Amino acid sequence: MSLRVACIGTGTVGSAFAVVFARAGHDVALFDAAPGAVETFALKRIRATLDLLETEGALAEPVEAIMSRIRPAASLADAVKGADYVQESVAEEVAVKRAVFAALGEAAPAGAILASSTSALAGSRFLDAAARPERCLVAHPVNPPSLIPLVEICPAPFTAAETVARARELLAAAGMSPVTLAREIDGFILNRLQYTLVAEALHLVGEGYCT
């Protein structure tokens, strides 16, 4: 089933999510607060990613067919108009995310899932800025999600169970491999495991076991 998806913030993560959703057959609207960011950078990055996937035989249809489902939006409100799912990928600053989710809460349809790509911030620090915060959660990907399917779904204490279930279903149908956290923890699971591995690697180098 084709859905309407909005990607808010179109840097590396936001652009990669656009690839994920458009490749899955969804209509994707892109918005970035930086003037010209979508046209100058995001669309080019998206096309380059799709070209790579096509070269590797990883696309089921031509690049142009997928690109035809992606459009730049004139505003945040334009991007989320009629959206079923919104993926936020803006700066990792609580104040910025609170402002964005407040705007999303006002502009997005009441039934839309509002998800954040935050890589470290607990969702409860900013998701409650949105109206009806029970439809909000964190969907933290491995970067870039267009190539690595793992995504951590982390509900805030106020996130509805139905929201988690719908997000899991939507992301899985888009080709991702969602795992769900039982409750919040700073850095989520993946980052904490990665940091532990890096710390041990540095310890081994420091002790002279390897270089």
Residue ranges and their predicted role:
Residues 1-52, 107:
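NAD(P)+-binding Rossmann beta1-loop-alpha1 motif at the extreme N-terminus of oxidoreductases
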Residues 188, 195-211:
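Active-site-lining helix/loop region of Rossmann-like oxidoreductase modules
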Residues 113-192:
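Rossmann-fold dinucleotide-binding core
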